[in-house]
């Protein structure tokens, strides 16, 4: 099964299960939540991004669901459904743990700057990020997975988990702009799968 996460980890972590993409957004939304709810706290776009990273680091996925999809089993399931990725529900816990490990090892942010215009109901946060370098990751793991673990999903995931943490798979710093909409008197992300795709290096162009 090939975890299809990053429309490119789609090859390796969900590749490994089709990994989430090989391991684990894309629609405009008015609420960034697994339950369709929005945060009751009125944060600016920059404060929202900082809050998301704080909650992700402490693994408070229930609170994080008020802002965007995270690394919970429910988020993984919704992400796979959104992206048309085949997955086996019994492996959701493992997908979640692997993606959380990728976040812990590779994702950083710095130099956040904000633009917010309530009149046009648009906002953005631009920053410097690092994430998983999916191209390098796939180059390193594809051959071994296909030759040695092709029909053994457990072995694929064990191998993937064993190489997460290698510094060579951390991307160089890249700039990215996170888009927001002002809806119902609060700022919400336009991309509900932002955190998952950032983690998988999808925005590192």
Language model region names:
Residues 147-154, 166-205:
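Short beta-strand edge/turn micro-motifs at domain boundaries
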Residues 36-113:
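Core segments of small alpha/beta cavity-forming domains
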Residues 3-19:
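Bacterial N-terminal signal peptides that target proteins for export
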Residues 32, 40, 70, 197-205:
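C-terminal or late-domain output modules
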Residues 27-31:
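C-terminal motif of bacterial Sec signal peptides marking the signal peptidase cleavage site
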Residues 68-72, 158, 171-176:
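Short glycine-rich, low-complexity/disordered patches
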Residues 87-163, 201-203:
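Surface-exposed, charged secondary-structure patches
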């Amino acid at each position: 099964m090939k975890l299809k996460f990053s429309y490119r980890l789609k090859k390796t972590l969900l590749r490994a299960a089709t990994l989430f993409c090989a391991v684990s957004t894309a629609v405009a939304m008015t609420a960034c939540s697994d339950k369709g709810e929005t945060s009751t706290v009125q944060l600016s776009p920059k404060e929202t991004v900082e809050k998301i990273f704080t909650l992700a680091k402490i693994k408070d996925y229930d609170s994080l669901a008020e802002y965007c999809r995270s690394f919970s089993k429910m988020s993984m399931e919704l992400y796979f459904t959104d992206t048309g990725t085949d997955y086996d529900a019994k492996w959701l816990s493992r997908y979640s743990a692997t993606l959380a490990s990728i976040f812990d090892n590779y994702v950083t942010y710095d130099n956040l700057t904000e633009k917010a215009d309530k009149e046009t109901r648009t906002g953005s946060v631009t920053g410097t990020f690092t994430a998983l370098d999916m191209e390098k990751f796939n180059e390193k793991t594809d051959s071994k997975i296909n030759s040695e673990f092709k029909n053994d999903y457990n072995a694929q995931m064990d191998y993937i988990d064993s190489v997460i943490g290698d510094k060579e798979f951390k991307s160089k710093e890249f700039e990215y702009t996170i888009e927001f909409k002002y809806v119902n008197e609060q700022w919400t992300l336009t991309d509900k799968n932002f955190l998952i795709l950032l983690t998988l290096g999808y925005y590192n162009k």
